[in-house]
């Protein structure tokens, strides 16, 4: 007998999430994971490493609450926003009974976390204008416990319409929790829906330090919600989820100086993004450039496979989304520093016209 037969059926059937790092391949220009292009120095004090860390480090909780404009009892720190997604499913969904709703094409971990927990998935694709289908979602509220929305959406870069979200939250009162993933919100902070937490106890917002804060390597995320939701999640989270060095780095990132550096990075990356989009508009191989509210641009090419192969041959690693619904020939490009973006454009300019 194979030892695999002892695993849960759902795990045996599970296809693991194909993270950018897992499927990236080999290259010297990495623009496939929406990471920041450069790392920044932090200091770590080792005098407390012999002790278990705080479950919820106060300096991090208070720092993020002040940054996000909420109360500390509305914040839960986790091992990345991915753990926040899983905690929400484990807390509010009964395995084998309940379902979540997602709007593909969108971030893959919502579905993976649900599958791992034995929770069903209802798919309600985005509309042709790449917005959630609000009436269709409202019709399914009796069937689901959690609705996951990503704003800006990964991979399309679109923002969730605020009016549609408010109407959905009204209809979902006492019926379902609506989760808005704001992993990329620092690149368009004016579009945050955190202010709606005061009106809707069934709204949850997830955040991360991985993108604009340039800290993907430390895996630190946040859940912003009503104190009641946070208290429920705190029952389920591991006893010591945030290692002491991670808490120290996160606290430094959330200090006034850390926030100022983050905002400077955002300004620079948004400039790079605008210049990159302007250059794309001049190229014969580009068919469509999607919305650009994150630190990435999704591009539909005339021949996406040829572009992806040419980039790979040049050692440039991008993320292919051509198999996702409505995204044929589409490739996502993370915004890096200028030299990296110039390298991408050089490959695109060298593509022979007859190929398209």
From Swiss-Prot:
A GO BP entry: L-histidine biosynthetic process
Pathway: Amino-acid biosynthesis; L-histidine biosynthesis; L-histidine from 5-phospho-alpha-D-ribose 1-diphosphate: step 7/9
EC number from the UniProt entry: 2.6.1.9
Enzyme class label: transferase
Cofactor dependency: pyridoxal 5'-phosphate
Keyword entries, A-Z: Amino-acid biosynthesis, Aminotransferase, Histidine biosynthesis, Pyridoxal phosphate, Transferase
Residues with PTM N6-(pyridoxal phosphate)lysine: 211
GO MF annotation terms: histidinol-phosphate transaminase activity; pyridoxal phosphate binding
Subunit structure: Homodimer.
HAMAP family in alphabetical order: HisC_aminotrans_2
Family as reported in the entry's similarity comment: Belongs to the class-II pyridoxal-phosphate-dependent aminotransferase family. Histidinol-phosphate aminotransferase subfamily.
Protein name listed in UniProt: Histidinol-phosphate aminotransferase
Native species: Aeromonas hydrophila subsp. hydrophila (strain ATCC 7966 / DSM 30187 / BCRC 13018 / CCUG 14551 / JCM 1027 / KCTC 2358 / NCIMB 9240 / NCTC 8049)
Taxonomic lineage of the native organism: Bacteria, Pseudomonadati, Pseudomonadota, Gammaproteobacteria, Aeromonadales
């Amino acid at each position: 007998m194979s030892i695999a037969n002892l695993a849960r059926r759902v795990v045996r059937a599970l296809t693991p999430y194909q993270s950018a790092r897992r499927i990236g391949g080999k290259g010297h220009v990495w623009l496939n994971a929406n990471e920041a292009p450069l790392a920044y120095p932090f200091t770590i004090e080792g005098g407390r490493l012999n002790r278990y860390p705080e479950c919820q480090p106060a300096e991090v909780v208070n720092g993020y609450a002040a940054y996000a404009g909420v109360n500390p009892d509305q914040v839960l720190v986790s091992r990345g926003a991915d753990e926040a997604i899983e905690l929400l499913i484990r807390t509010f969904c009964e395995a084998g009974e309940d379902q979540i709703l997602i709007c593909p094409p969108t971030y893959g971990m919502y579905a993976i976390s649900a599958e791992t927990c034995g929770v069903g998935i209802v798919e309600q694709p985005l509309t042709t204008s790449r917005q959630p289908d609000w009436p269709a979602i409202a019709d399914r509220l009796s069937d689901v416990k959690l609705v996951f929305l990503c704003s800006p959406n990964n991979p399309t870069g679109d923002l969730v319409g605020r009016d549609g979200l408010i109407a959905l939250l009204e209809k979902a009162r006492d019926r379902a929790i609506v989760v808005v993933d704001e992993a990329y919100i620092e690149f368009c902070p004016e579009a945050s829906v955190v202010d709606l937490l005061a009106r809707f106890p069934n709204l949850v917002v997830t955040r991360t330090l991985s993108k604009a804060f340039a800290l993907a390597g430390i895996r630190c995320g946040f859940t912003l919600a009503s104190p009641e939701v946070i208290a429920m999640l705190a029952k389920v989270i591991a006893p010591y989820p945030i290692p002491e060095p991670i808490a120290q780095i996160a606290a430094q990132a959330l200090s006034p100086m850390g926030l100022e550096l983050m905002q400077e990075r955002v300004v620079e990356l948004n400039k790079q993004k605008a210049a990159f989009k302007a250059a794309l508009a001049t190229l014969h191989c580009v068919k469509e450039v999607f919305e650009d509210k994150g630190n990435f641009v999704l591009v539909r090419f005339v021949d996406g496979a040829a572009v992806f192969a040419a980039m790979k041959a040049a050692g440039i690693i991008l993320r292919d989304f051509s198999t996702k619904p409505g995204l044929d020939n589409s490739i996502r490009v993370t915004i890096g520093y200028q030299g990296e973006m110039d390298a991408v454009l050089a490959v695109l300019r060298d593509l022979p016209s007859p190929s398209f």
